[in-house]
């Protein structure tokens, strides 16, 4: 059903010619971001075309600035993440291909849908959580006939540290089994939008996409991702779907970050991250420039900013809760059971910290009054009998940490 044919032949061996590749496991001596910046600068100075993958947009901007400051040969280091304007992203991609840009600090925006390969080195600052994602990022390294290097830098969390101590798990284990729930609207929605860019959607498409098609189409129309004309739905934007939306999940309408002095759109923040990224008083980083948020207007999908050098950076403080809506399946597991079903996730930004950009010391904590956001999705939970918890001597905090 996935590809429209009944019989397929499995190809599970890679027989393509590949140059030699060294994989290095790295325990940071300083902080992860400091070591990543220093290593990228060293690689650039040695003439290596480099990609460094990091875990968040903010870290990408910070590492890019610090790496550029340490380059001594005139090489160019740039950040690459979602939220850049399409032309900015295309310029960076072209710069990498031509050699005008020597290194990029990227989020997984560069992991998907971008034809960039043949790098001399890939630095992965923090295990991405899945072997498939690790090897996809590592696969960017390797020019024809030239030896390449992949460096995995471990974070301080238990999973990264365990992998560094047991590297055989990286090299001898097969990638994870793909878990697919195509009817999940938060997964199906972005792919329908991308399909609509290629050709309009119509009722007959239910034979391909299944009975959830109409429900997800209605959601996309409400969010103004698609426009309906009669029984057909169209992608109406000039840019590519891969640039405008997250193909992994549906985040809703993006928030434009606008220069309050000129009216120019500086960048775009996806709706799910906007409260944490462009709340009033936030420092918004974009290609090494610092912008201070003057106003955040979620109903108008925009934030007004001005260029500044405030001497601090901001860290949002938020709270979240999960409520089980419906249990669909249950399986015994140890003394308890594991269940799956529908859950409701509620999150709210409560305030933010201002931290010194040099020493990282906390200046102060500022409270915010922000709306809470609720999303219904699929979830998995593990239930342990109270008697077992009491016998182990675990309070609520220790139990959450143990899980």
Enumerate the language-model features and the residues they cover:
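Extended Lys/Arg-rich polyanion-binding regions
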Residues: 147-150, 156-173, 186, 191-203, ...
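Helicase motor core with emphasis on the C-terminal RecA-like subdomain
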Residues: 1-201, 205-242, 249-252, 262
């Amino acid at each position: 059903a996935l590809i429209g044919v009944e019989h397929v032949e499995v190809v599970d061996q890679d027989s393509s010619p590949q140059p030699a590749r060294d994989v290095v496991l790295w325990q940071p001596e300083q902080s992860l971001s400091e070591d990543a910046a220093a290593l990228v600068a060293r690689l650039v100075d040695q003439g290596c075309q480099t990609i460094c993958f990091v875990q968040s947009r903010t870290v990408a901007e910070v590492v890019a600035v610090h790496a550029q400051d340490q380059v001594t040969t005139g090489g160019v280091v740039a950040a690459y993440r979602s939220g850049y304007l399409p032309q900015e992203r295309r310029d960076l991609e072209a710069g990498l291909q031509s050699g005008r840009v020597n290194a990029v600090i990227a989020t997984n925006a560069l992991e998907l849908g971008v034809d960039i390969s043949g790098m001399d080195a890939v630095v992965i600052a923090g295990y991405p959580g899945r072997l498939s994602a690790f090897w996809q990022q590592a696969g960017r390294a390797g020019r024809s006939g030239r030896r390449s290097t992949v460096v995995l830098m471990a974070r301080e969390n238990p999973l990264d540290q365990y992998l560094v101590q047991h590297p055989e798990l990286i090299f001898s284990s097969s990638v994870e089994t793909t878990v697919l729930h195509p009817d999940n609207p938060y997964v199906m929605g972005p792919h329908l939008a991308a399909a609509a860019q290629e050709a309009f959607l119509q009722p007959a498409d239910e034979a391909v996409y299944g009975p959830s098609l109409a429900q997800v189409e209605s959601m996309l129309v409400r969010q103004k991702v698609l426009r309906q004309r009669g029984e057909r739905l169209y992608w109406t934007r000039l840019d590519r779907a891969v640039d405008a939306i997250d193909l992994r999940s549906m985040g809703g309408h993006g928030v434009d970050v606008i220069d309050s002095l000129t009216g120019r759109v500086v960048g775009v923040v996806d709706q799910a991250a906007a409260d944490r990224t462009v709340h009033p008083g936030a420092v918004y980083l974009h290609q090494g420039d610092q912008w201070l948020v003057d106003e955040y207007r979620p109903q108008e999908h925009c934030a007004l900013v001005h260029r500044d050098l405030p001497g601090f950076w901001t860290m949002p403080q938020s709270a979240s809760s999960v409520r089980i809506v419906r249990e669909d399946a249950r399986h015994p597991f140890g003394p308890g059971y594991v269940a799956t079903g529908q859950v409701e996730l509620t999150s709210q930004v409560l305030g933010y910290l201002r931290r010194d950009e040099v020493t990282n010391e906390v200046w102060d904590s500022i409270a915010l009054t922000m709306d809470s956001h609720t999303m219904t999705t699929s979830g998995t939970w593990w239930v342990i009998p109270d008697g077992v918890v009491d016998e182990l001597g675990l309070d609520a905090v220790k139990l959450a940490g143990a899980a």
